[in-house]
């Protein structure tokens, strides 16, 4: 009777931390294949904090149009005095 009683294997499994599962499928069979998949895929429970992705923006990769200010992009949108005089000269020549 000096022999210590070992707990049941089911109780050992309950207290063991969940092993990571690398299965990426969300079908019904894969969602119920283990406890971790059921919690994550079936119920949508996440116990880890998801990291937000950093913006990996460098000056070389950005579009030059987006870097310019609004006034710079639309600078040729309005007529100028030089444009008016050229049009008037062309009209007077006809």
Swiss-Prot record:
Family listed:
Belongs to the lentiviruses Tat family.
- Composition-biased stretches, type Basic and acidic residues, lie in 81-94
By what name is this protein known?
Protein Tat
Q: Which InterPro entries match?
A: IV_Tat, Tat_dom_sf
Q: For this UniProt entry, what is the primary localization, expressed as one broad class? A: host cell
**What GO terms are given for molecular function?**
RNA binding; RNA-binding transcription regulator activity
Nuclear localization signal, and RNA-binding (TAR) (motif): residue ranges: 49-55
Subunit composition?
Interacts with host CCNT1. Associates with the P-TEFb complex composed at least of Tat, P-TEFb (CDK9 and CCNT1), TAR RNA, RNA Pol II. Interacts with CCNT2; the resulting complex is unable to bind to TAR RNA.
Q: Where is this region: Core?
A: 38-48
Q: Name one GO biological process term.
A: positive regulation of viral transcription
Q: Locate the region Cysteine-rich.
A: 21-37
Tell me which species this is from: Simian immunodeficiency virus agm.grivet (isolate AGM gr-1) (SIV-agm.gri)
Provide this UniProt record's keywords sorted from A to Z. Activator, Host nucleus, Host-virus interaction, RNA-binding, Transcription, Transcription regulation
Annotated GO CC locations: host cell nucleolus
């Amino acid at each position: 009777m000096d022999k210590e009683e070992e707990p049941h294997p089911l109780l050992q499994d309950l207290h063991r931390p969940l092993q990571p599962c690398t299965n990426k499928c969300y079908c019904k069979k894969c969602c119920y294949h283990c406890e971790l998949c059921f919690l994550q895929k079936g119920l949508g429970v996440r116990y880890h904090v998801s990291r937000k992705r950093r913006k990996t923006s460098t000056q070389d990769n950005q579009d030059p149009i987006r870097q310019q200010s609004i006034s710079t992009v639309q600078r040729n949108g309005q007529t100028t005095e030089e444009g008016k005089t050229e049009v008037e000269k062309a009209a007077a020549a006809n």
